[in-house]
């Protein structure tokens, strides 16, 4: 069915006021969008940042009167409205549209990430079937791609691999399909642990092959291979801990790092690892090396 969409151009300071007011006058959803292609990376802890110029989009039932909505907003906020407009939009099958756009992707020589509803393009390749969970890795982001390609290029047979910040489990599962003996995944998000477990089962990974932990429950260990696709800040602050999780002679790959942050992150690991040249893609980098 169609919907009435109301759009307001607001500042971050106005966001909460107008969100509350729109919900009070009957909006069924309220969404904030960047108005000027302004990226936000690594926000401070316990903050929900907005762009300096933000579009607020609210959906109403199609029979809602936009002039009445605007009149109620003026009444509730006690102020003239910022730049605003209303239009009727047709409903779409958003899930189907998204599924159609998520296609199989190849990483390196052997590895494919294949949506579970899609046929594998190469039956004899290493095919990882994925139903991505909310906000977790699918391989479409450059940092995930950098890590997957790195894993594809390693000799993983017989190794133990640690996926630190496992998200969907895509890196741990890829390592197992590429020959790792066992993998360990850890994440601070319980939903990530569940998504990883579901994706492992979808790929026929036995429970004893993949151990999943919240950080506080992870046992002491030194892995043969550690991959961490998180953020530069945690990678720097956790450098002593992550370095200690890799055995002497073991391998490390880090991503989730902006290009301008690469040297700082590399410096945090240089004492403990013989580092490879930094690999850059689309403004993101991968740092890898071997434990001294």
Curated annotation (Swiss-Prot):
Molecular function in Gene Ontology: protein-lysine N-methyltransferase activity
Example GO BP: methylation
An example Gene Ontology CC term for this record: cytosol
Physiological role: Methylates ribosomal protein L11.
Record localization: Cytoplasm
Presence of the UniProt keyword Cytoplasm in the record: yes
Organism of origin: Pseudomonas putida (strain ATCC 47054 / DSM 6125 / CFBP 8728 / NCIMB 11950 / KT2440)
Reactions that this protein is recorded to catalyse: L-lysyl-[protein] + 3 S-adenosyl-L-methionine = N(6),N(6),N(6)-trimethyl-L-lysyl-[protein] + 3 S-adenosyl-L-homocysteine + 3 H(+)
Keywords attached to this entry: Cytoplasm, Methyltransferase, S-adenosyl-L-methionine, Transferase
EC identifiers of the protein: 2.1.1.-
InterPro entries per the UniProt record, alphabetical: Ribosomal_L11_MeTrfase_PrmA, Ribosomal_PrmA_MeTrfase, SAM-dependent_MTases_sf
Spans through the membrane: none
Transferase in keyword set: yes
Protein family: Belongs to the methyltransferase superfamily. PrmA family.
Name of the protein in its database record: Ribosomal protein L11 methyltransferase
Gene that produces this protein: prmA
Amino-acid positions noted as binding S-adenosyl-L-methionine in the UniProt annotation, renumbered to this chain: 144, 165, 187, 229
HAMAP family: Methyltr_PrmA
Pfam families (alphabetical): PrmA
Top-level taxon in the UniProt lineage: Bacteria
């Amino acid at each position: 069915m169609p919907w009435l969409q109301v759009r307001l151009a607001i500042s971050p300071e106005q966001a909460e006021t107008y969100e509350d007011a729109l919900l009070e006058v009957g909006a069924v959803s309220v969404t904030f969008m960047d108005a000027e292609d302004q990226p936000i990376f690594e926000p401070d802890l316990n903050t929900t940042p907005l762009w300096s110029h933000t579009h607020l989009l609210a959906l109403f039932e199609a029979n809602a009167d936009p002039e009445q909505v605007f009149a109620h907003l003026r009444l509730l906020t006690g102020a003239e409205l910022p730049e605003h407009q209303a239009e009727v939009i047709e409903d779409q099958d958003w899930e189907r549209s998204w599924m159609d756009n998520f296609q199989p992707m190849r990483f390196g020589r052997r590895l494919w990430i294949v949506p579970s509803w899609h046929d594998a393009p190469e039956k004899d390749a290493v095919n990882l079937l994925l139903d991505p969970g909310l906000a977790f890795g699918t391989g479409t982001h450059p940092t995930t791609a950098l890590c997957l390609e790195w894993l594809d290029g390693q000799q993983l047979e017989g190794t133990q691999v640690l996926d630190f910040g496992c998200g969907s489990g895509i890196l741990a599962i890829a390592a197992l399909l590429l020959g790792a003996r066992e993998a360990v995944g850890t994440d601070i998000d319980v939903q990530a642990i569940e998504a990883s477990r579901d994706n492992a089962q979808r790929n026929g990974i036995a429970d004893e092959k993949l151990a999943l932990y919240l950080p506080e429950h992870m046992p002491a260990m030194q892995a043969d291979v550690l991959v961490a696709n998180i953020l530069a800040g945690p990678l720097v602050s956790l450098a002593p801990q992550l370095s200690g999780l890799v055995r002497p002679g073991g391998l490390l790959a880090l991503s989730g790092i902006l290009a301008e942050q690469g040297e700082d992150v590399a410096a945090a690991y240089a004492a403990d690892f013989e580092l490879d040249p930094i690999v850059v893609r689309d403004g993101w980098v991968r740092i890898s090396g071997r434990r001294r």
